[in-house]
Amino acid sequence: MAVRELCFPRQRQVLFLFLFWGVSLAGSGFGRYSVTEETEKGSFVVNLAKDLGLAEGELAARGTRVVSDDNKQYLLLDSHTGNLLTNEKLDREKLCGPKEPCMLYFQILMDDPFQIYRAELRVRDINDHAPVFQDKETVLKISENTAEGTAFRLERAQDPDGGLNGIQNYTISPNSFFHINISGGDEGMIYPELVLDKALDREEQGELSLTLTALDGGSPSRSGTSTVRIVVLDVNDNAPQFAQALYETQAPENSPIGFLIVKVWAEDVDSGVNAEVSYSFFDASENIRTTFQINPFSGEIFLRELLDYELVNSYKINIQAMDGGGLSARCRVLVEVLDTNDNPPELIVSSFSNSVAENSPETPLAVFKINDRDSGENGKMVCYIQENLPFLLKPSVENFYILITEGALDREIRAEYNITITVTDLGTPRLKTEHNITVLVSDVNDNAPAFTQTSYTLFVRENNSPALHIGSVSATDRDSGTNAQVTYSLLPPQDPHLPLASLVSINADNGHLFALRSLDYEALQAFEFRVGATDRGSPALSREALVRVLVLDANDNSPFVLYPLQNGSAPCTELVPRAAEPGYLVTKVVAVDGDSGQNAWLSYQLLKATEPGLFGVWAHNGEVRTARLLSERDAAKHRLVVLVKDNGEPPRSATATLHLLLVDGFSQPYLPLPEAAPAQAQAEADLLTVYLVVALASVSSLFLLSVLLFVAVRLCRRSRAASVGRCSVPEGPFPGHLVDVRGAETLSQSYQYEVCLTGGPGTSEFKFLKPVISDIQAQGPGRKGEENSTFRNSFGFNIQ
């Protein structure tokens, strides 16, 4: 059966017309091999590696396989040795029948690169069949007046073997009336003819029995016999005559059993028994006798067995008509079997790989062959796959197709494809065959890990415990398997002074970040670093993200009082004039807090006072002011305890103790800088010496009285100075800009210092006093000098 295949592109369809055996995809030659039939399974045919000129082991490395046209595995390839072996006993007669030579066509498929080699195997015949006559006895009715030399064709014997192993000669048993003549027939066949050598005489011998022997040409020769019985008849001078020498008819292959194929008819002009014609098959094969039957009286030929166009597409039937007198005639009936679309297309997969790397464009996945046993339009096929798939069907040779990837695949978009290969014929009705294959896309490392965020901000409260989990980073990889396994690491910091290795660590498997030591907000408020995420593919891909760590302040620092100093030294007394108005600024408590935010928000509160209600502390700036007018009944000395508290949780606090002294006639003295006071005191001492000399000269007349009076006055004034607390206010202005500090936690106005002296060798300390106000600045130098002189003289000593 000749199969033509038509394929043309339509969407994903591939249609191709095979008009002849094409050229191999690899441009290879045509291999011809042979083997004797009936050889045992596993018999050696050829070494393909040597025959194809391939290196040892190349057949196995390239996945070489053998594919037969009818998908039957007659041959087996040992890819390691390269030997091509028979996979079963080959019977030439079953494979090819009488056809000679008997050829089996197959293909050799190899990958990397893909190649197809066409080859054929000839099955050589052996003489394993003896000739066989279909009829064990043949009856010939011969009239006694038959002329000498008349030939009577006999039915030939059947021998499945071919060539020299087929029938080569016929013989007849010895007799005095007949001999055998060999005549040629169609398709190179020989037929025996029985030739009359001597006239018959019915009255002398009415019947003869001869043995016909058929001999083949094998070695040793095989033979078969049949009996020829000759009946001598009276004279019958007219033989039957067929209306046609050749009857041609057609029968669809799906015709039912009993279907009338054709009716033959022969006429005999004799009369009586000599005119009675009977019909029979003549020299018919076993296949014809089992497929058809003939009515011996009417000449009607009926279908005895279903037809199959794909097995036999035509029959040649020899019909013999014989009259009652033994005369016969022959005709031939040619039956053409009409093909119907009763065979769906066949799809035979020769090789298939269910996995393909995602970065492998135009990679062969499957090699398959399509076939339709029908003919004509019924045998034309359309082959296609679904639309919108990244695959192509590429036609090869001899009905072969290759399924390849159209381009690079992306496993992250789609990891599995279910492909349906559909083969449809063009018959009516159309028949189709579907073959489903599943292709898995294997992963390659083409995606770097991706962090869930480009930057991370982590918060950790100071004074944390070491190894505290402070946060995590996370990265995902769209690949799979080891290509998606992510390892985290710390990258070298951009700031070379940042001791990152001693601050944080990262879990390489899950990205958890840990603080290695306790953090101190006051030392390090924030820092940043980069983390890397690397997969385990080859080559490895990585990506990095920025991590910012903000240290949150904890209330771990208590307020610290800057003024007045609380260092355990002798307390410094603040002077408050009794004439001060309500709200008069006595002093200011200055404190700071090492924390930040609300932990450093300070508030002030008067905790204890000698006389409650006399003084008040402003909560937000620590200023100590008078709450009411002072009176003579108020005590001269006062002790205040001020509580300084931050706004943390829990709050921390500190206390400051203030000593206040209420004085009369004290306005707003200026205090010089502590370091300037000794020089000015020295100048005043020198001036006092001059005054003393002048005084002594002026009162020389009153020497004794003056001395006594002077000593008495000095002693009196020293006693008064001791009762004031031995505090002296140096003369001279104090530069306000040196202590003008802005801010909620420090001084907001200009203050002066006060030097406090003890009764010892002269150790002193300084502290802030009341602000310098404008009425003091309005006083002239003379007034200041007078007041300072008065102040010095009233206390009775100079500051050194």
From Swiss-Prot:
One of its GO terms (biological process) is chemical synaptic transmission. The keyword Signal applies. Residues 1-26 form the signal peptide. InterPro entries: Cadherin-like_dom, Cadherin-like_sf, Cadherin_C, Cadherin_CS, Cadherin_N, Protocadherin/Cadherin-CA. The chain crosses the membrane at residues 693-713. It is found in: Cell membrane. GO terms for molecular function: calcium ion binding. This is Protocadherin beta-10. The gene is PCDHB10.
